[in-house]
């Protein structure tokens, strides 16, 4: 029987879910409680604590049929740079629709996920950090400023949650400094990506992507195409023409990830981290460091899209919005 398009992608993702790198001892392993229909899911959640006072909080979300173990290497990079990182593992299959990606209607679950970031000091997010820290309760206060980073289908989830904060939680929305999308992928069903980005487009919230070329594992660039079509901005990120879908995972990818989606390219892994660390620093500080944005632009009134190159990653292709 021949399988094409989404069916092949689902098969590949299900195979990927069978293996994941184990958590290492230098993270703070824990759980997070998320309401799901009439029940509560208790999901694995890793925290990565910086050595000093956190510069901000990062929610780092894995992709379809992956787990937080596949984000461990990237999470440590961000923690080493001074950020407190929250990395939960979310289901990709659930009979009640409580899934990372949309397989029917997962919006109720994503609404519950957004509530984690509502700012409740006695909420599930604070409880998860406190439990993970154990005796080190002096560091349990959550930073009030945060950035969401999502890989693959995790990018759609962070887009949706950001839009939900904008619509329902104004105090929490004020603390959201930006979104970073890593080779984003739209769900096979529904329009969560387009609805979220349409809501966010006019807000001025920084939203940038690091994408690879179209492939089976990124649903042929569906999330990147949606971003470029929906955001009315001259610059929405970059594409690495030699990129693979696992570049974001780096050393936390695995054999099946490498076989099905391509092994991470060391040069691209390094460039992705250089660029996203630069963007993170700018998002939290409210600055624009020239090294991480297009220079040598040839924009005119007739051709307003960003062009040129980015000094920190000169080989990257600059992606304009609409």
Regions found by a protein language model. Name each.
Residues 103-143:
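Alpha/beta-hydrolase active-site loop
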Residues 25-53:
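N-terminal cap/lid segment of alpha/beta-hydrolase-fold proteins
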Residues 171-245:
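The feature captures the conserved acid-bearing segment of alpha/beta-hydrolase catalytic domains
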Residues 54-63:
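Short beta-strand element of the alpha/beta-hydrolase
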Residues 69-88:
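Short amphipathic alpha-helix adjacent to the substrate-entry channel of hydrolases
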């Amino acid at each position: 029987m021949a399988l094409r398009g989404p069916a092949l992608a689902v098969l590949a993702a299900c195979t990927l879910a069978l293996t994941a790198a184990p958590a290492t001892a230098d993270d703070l392993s824990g759980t997070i409680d998320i309401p799901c229909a009439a029940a509560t899911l208790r999901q694995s959640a890793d925290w990565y604590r910086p050595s000093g006072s956190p510069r901000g909080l990062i929610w780092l979300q894995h992709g379809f049929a992956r787990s937080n173990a596949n984000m461990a290497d990237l999470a440590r990079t961000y923690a080493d740079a001074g950020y407190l990182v929250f990395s939960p593992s979310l289901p990709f299959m659930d009979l009640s629709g409580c899934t990372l990606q949309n397989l029917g209607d997962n919006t109720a679950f994503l609404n519950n996920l957004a509530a984690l970031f509502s700012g409740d000091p006695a909420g599930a997010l604070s409880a998860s950090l406190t439990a993970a820290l154990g005796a080190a309760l002096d560091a349990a206060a959550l930073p009030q400023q945060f950035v969401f980073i999502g890989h693959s289908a995790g990018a759609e989830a962070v887009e949706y949650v950001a839009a939900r904060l904008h619509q329902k939680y104004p105090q929490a929305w004020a603390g959201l400094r930006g979104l970073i999308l890593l080779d984003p992928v739209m769900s096979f069903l529904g329009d969560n990506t387009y609805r979220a980005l349409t809501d966010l487009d006019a807000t001025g919230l920084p939203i940038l992507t690091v994408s690879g070329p179209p492939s089976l594992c990124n649903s042929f660039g569906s999330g990147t195409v949606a971003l470029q079509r929906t955001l009315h901005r001259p610059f929405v990120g970059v594409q690495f023409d030699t990129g693979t879908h696992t570049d974001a995972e780096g050393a936390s990818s695995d054999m099946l990830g490498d076989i099905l989606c391509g092994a991470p390219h060391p040069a691209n892994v390094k460039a992705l981290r250089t660029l996203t660390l630069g963007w993170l620093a700018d998002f939290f500080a409210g600055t624009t460091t020239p090294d991480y944005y297009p220079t040598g632009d040839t924009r005119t009134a007739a051709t307003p899209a960003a062009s040129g190159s980015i000094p920190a990653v000169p080989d990257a292709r600059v992606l304009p919005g609409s």
